[in-house]
């Protein structure tokens, strides 16, 4: 069987999304290997697939030449630029890049995403074009065993962090939102990673369960009713499991592309476009967007999501 490699960006969400490509490669007759920084965590979710941590840049040419086809998610990292260079010099000719945004490095055979569609849908269309497989967003994520889908329908998971602090809504607003939701009869649980836990443990009155692995987080999400959070990987995981999501962000343009794209979801963004004055280093959209997304705005978006979710159940 022909062998293929997928080179992912660093986020958990990127890994889940690129598994769409892995499924298409299987349909096209390839045996895929997925390169990702969180290879060990993702392998617990996709037990029948092969994950390998990214190799040192100096080893890329030797390692990737062992594969018949290589699909790369462009993240403008040092690794991606090294691969651009190797391809332009004819050292790695079998590379195909997925470009979320336009780039001078696009070559014939690469795929530029449509910014009006989700990444999940873009990847399914890219694979149809590149591999000739039917367009589908399925990534073969196995559902948790011995768990009940949406068992706790009124349980809301709030994921208040991300891998970029500038993407995070204000902590005090997450807490205010939680109190408001609890008054409406919902059970609210906060979910944070080990590195963020110390900032949240001392807050009185919140539920903050401890999880031993991404697999345990997945199982907990699967039995919950909703997930609310920033633009982060857990939103993609919830959507992948069929759990409705509400994503809070200051960048509507980015979110049109990167919002969770497997099941129903809503977004909460500022009520009007925010500028970035780069010349005077006043990046309002980047650094101050949180001030323009109120608790009431997010709460209303959640009520709309909950109502839509109810309609989908019948």
What are these regions (language model features)?
Residues 1-314:
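Catalytic machinery of carbohydrate-active enzymes
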């Amino acid at each position: 069987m022909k062998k293929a490699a997928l080179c992912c960006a660093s986020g958990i969400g990127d890994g889940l999304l690129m598994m769409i490509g892995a499924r298409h490669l299987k349909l096209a007759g390839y045996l895929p290997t997925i390169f990702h920084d969180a290879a060990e965590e993702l392998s617990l979710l996709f037990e029948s697939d092969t994950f390998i941590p990214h190799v040192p840049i100096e080893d890329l040419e030797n390692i990737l030449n062992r594969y018949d086809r290589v699909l790369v998610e462009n993240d403008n990292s040092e690794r991606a630029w090294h691969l651009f260079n190797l391809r332009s010099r004819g050292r790695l000719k079998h590379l195909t890049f997925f470009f979320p945004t336009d780039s001078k490095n696009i070559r014939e055979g690469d795929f530029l995403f449509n910014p009006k569609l989700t990444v999940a849908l873009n990847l399914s269309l890219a694979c149809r074009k590149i591999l000739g497989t039917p367009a589908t967003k399925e990534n073969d994520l196995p559902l948790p065993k011995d768990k009940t889908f949406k068992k706790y329908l009124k349980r809301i998971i709030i994921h208040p962090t991300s891998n970029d602090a500038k993407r995070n809504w204000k902590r005090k607003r997450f807490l205010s939102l939680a109190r408001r939701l609890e008054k409406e009869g919902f059970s609210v649980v906060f979910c944070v990673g080990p590195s963020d836990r110390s900032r949240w443990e001392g807050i009185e009155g919140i539920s903050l369960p401890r999880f031993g692995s991404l697999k345990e987080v997945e199982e907990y999400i699967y039995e919950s009713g909703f997930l609310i959070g920033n633009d982060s990987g857990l939103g993609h995981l919830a959507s992948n499991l069929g759990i409705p999501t509400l994503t809070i962000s200051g960048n509507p343009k980015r979110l049109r592309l990167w919002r969770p794209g497997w099941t129903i979801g809503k977004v909460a963004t500022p009520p009007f476009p925010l500028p970035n004055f780069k010349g005077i280093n006043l990046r309002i959209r980047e650094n101050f967007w949180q001030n323009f997304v109120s608790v009431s705005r997010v709460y209303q978006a959640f009520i709309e999501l909950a109502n839509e979710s109810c309609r989908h159940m019948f």
